[in-house]
Amino acid sequence: MARWPWRWRVLLPLLLLHSSPVFAQEGQDNDPSTLFKRASEMMNLRKYDGSLGLLNAVLEVDPNHSEAYRQRASVLRHKCRYKEAEGDYSKYLELKPGSSSVEKELSQLLQAQNALESAYGQFESHDFSKVLEYINKIVLVFSPNCLKAKLLKAKALLALEDYSSVISETGFILKEDEDNLDALLLRGRAYYYLADHDVASRHYQKGLRLDPEHSELKKAYFGLKNLLKKTKSAEDNAAKGKLRVSAEDYKAALAMDPDHTSYNVHLYLGLCKVLVKLGRGKEAISSCTEALNIDGELVDALTQRGEAKLLTEDWEGAVQDLKEASQKSPQDMGIREALMRAEKQLKLSKRKDWYKILGISKTASAADIKRAYKKLALQWHPDKNVDNREEAENMFREIAAAYEVLGDEDKRVRYDRGEDLDEMNMGGGGGGFNPFGGGGQQYTFHYDGGFYGGGGFPGGGFPGGFQFNFG
């Protein structure tokens, strides 16, 4: 107990020293003039909540303080509490009727109120540009601290995909109220659509810590979590060679949010690569085209689409895509190699397909080639096609030229490799091979003037007149 007197001896002089100013301040706080002056200072500093509290105190002490009503009406208008503000303006005009300046402020209030209502209506009609016009040109001019208008503006900007502006606008809101759930949600969504998923997730998580049952925050947070999980599954399965499973994972991820273009561009590209490996060229082209519709400068998507077009034998399309990709990335040897393959295939596609002319596959044996040649030569001999002689002559030449190449093992190998063959050597006779010789049957063709086209059958000119003999 002896300690307490000692403490009082130390503390009592300090209490007495500070008590007079405290009590004096309490007395000053009840003075309407002092309170009003402080309220005006706080309003000038845009500390509207503090100013509003002081003005409430003024009017409690002096219910007829007209300037306090006007000042409070102005604060309430700034915060878009229009009905309360209208009541204070009306009270001021009761105390001081005929004030043109206050009547003007009241008119501005009604104008801002109507504009805010119109902005909400335009938002429901999805005319988001009109929403911004009402808010920027009217509401925030007369009510610069209107939280409802700022949040509606951020929502309109989000709908217009102006994500950077959403981040900026919600940043101002969170600076004044760091726990504003609507602002946290909108800002998180803006970062999400910019594919900055880590920052988006942090905003969602902060909001959920404040309100774990907030339905929109929960939907946004778990939606993002599931999207990233499905993407990882697609990438992991592709790396393991489980291409069909990977393709289904990519498709599932793309279905989660079709509007998430900044992220979906990578999903489309990943899907395209998997489909190319699966040999599903048509689907791959579609997927890569979706990626390029989002980002036309994506070289990897151009390259993969070129590869996909090779699968569908769209040689010209493949060359076009790969050439563009090569121009954008001239040092990439992989692209250059793919372009060379495409150009070679395009060149090959423009030459005659001798296999097709003889109606045989590319794996046909020498005997198959000879058999097909004999059959077609008999079928299209001009003497047997008097009614369509010109067509028969052309077909006869084609058949002979095809056999000139495919009936010669060396020429066939070179042809299959895609090498250029001297077309002059393809069209006429000049070898020493008679495909109709030997084998127990003798084929003699009679045609006045020799072989059509000036060459004769491959393996000889067969000049003069001769006829079919089946011996």
From Swiss-Prot:
Glycan-carrying positions: 64
Protein's recorded name: DnaJ protein P58IPK homolog B
Source organism (scientific name): Oryza sativa subsp. japonica (Rice)
Location of the J domain: 353-419
Entries under Gene3D superfamilies matching the protein: DnaJ domain, Tetratricopeptide repeat domain
Subunit architecture: Interacts with BIP1.
TPR repeats, residue ranges: 32-65, 66-99, 112-146, 148-180, 181-214, 227-260, 265-298, 300-332
Induction statement: By dithiothreitol- and tunicamycin-induced endoplasmic reticulum (ER) stress response.
InterPro entries: DnaJ_domain, DnaJ_domain_CS, J_dom_sf, TPR-like_helical_dom_sf, TPR_rpt
Keywords, in A-Z order: Chaperone, Endoplasmic reticulum, Glycoprotein, Repeat, Signal, TPR repeat
Annotated CDD domains: DnaJ (cd06257)
Extent of the signal sequence: 1-24
Primary role: May play a role in protein folding in the endoplasmic reticulum.
PANTHER family from the UniProt entry: DNAJ HOMOLOG SUBFAMILY C MEMBER 7, DNAJ PROTEIN P58IPK HOMOLOG
TM ranges: none
GO cellular component: endoplasmic reticulum lumen
Compartments reported by the entry: Endoplasmic reticulum lumen
